[in-house]
Regions:
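Short polybasic/polar patches that bind polyanions
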Residues: 4, 57, 147
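Conserved inter-motif catalytic segment of the P-loop NTP-binding fold
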Residues: 9-11, 19, 29-31, 35-68, ...
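Phosphate-binding/switch region of NTP-binding enzymes
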Residues: 136, 140-169
Length: 169
């Protein structure tokens, strides 16, 4: 809440950018694990649901140990079901924007995470995922969706050596 000046603003997009491997996905997952009062759709274009589950379990155990000093062996932690859903988080491994929008209609989330924007593509643009035109169009479509639906979106994006959003120039 403090970082975002009071929390997620309805209808907004928050871009979390950084170098690959710096911890953007882990930070985001750690944050949404604590948002148990919201239905969250976590869209992953890079990792499998199993990989996300392993990280979430590790984070949940660490957080619980910090809270009450319990050993990791005795903790009840968030666990991923075989369908890919936490209690309040649904994980969708998909890179096609149109399919993501269809899934949003089914899940009716209150927050959406896209990890990462460079992996998402739309049929509206004839270029490869991660290209500047794909990143721009997908981000613009997600912004339009966020504004019309009131659902906040977190976009995770990689930056290059120059410090700009990654993607072919």
């Amino acid at each position: 809440n403090r970082v975002l000046g009071g929390g997620m603003v309805p209808g907004s997009i928050t871009l979390l950018g950084g170098e690959p491997g710096i911890g953007k996905s882990t930070l985001t997952l750690q944050t949404i694990l604590n948002m148990t009062d919201r239905r969250i759709l976590y869209v992953s274009g890079e990792e499998s649901a199993h990989q996300i589950k392993l990280r979430a379990d590790r984070l949940a155990k660490g957080q619980a140990m910090l809270r009450d000093g319990s050993s990791a062996d005795t903790l009840k932690t968030a666990s991923l079901s075989s369908e890919g859903a936490f209690d309040h988080i649904t994980v969708l491994c998909e890179t096609q924007l149109e399919k993501i929008f269809s899934h949003i209609q089914e899940v009716a989330p209150q927050l959406i995470v896209i990890d990462s924007i460079q992996t998402i593509s739309t049929e509206e643009v004839d270029s490869s995922p991660g290209s500047v035109s794909q990143v721009r169009e997908c981000a613009a479509s997600l912004l339009r969706f966020a504004k019309t639906s009131g659902i906040p979106v977190i976009l995770i994006g990689h930056i290059n050596k120059e410090g700009t959003l990654a993607g072919p120039k």
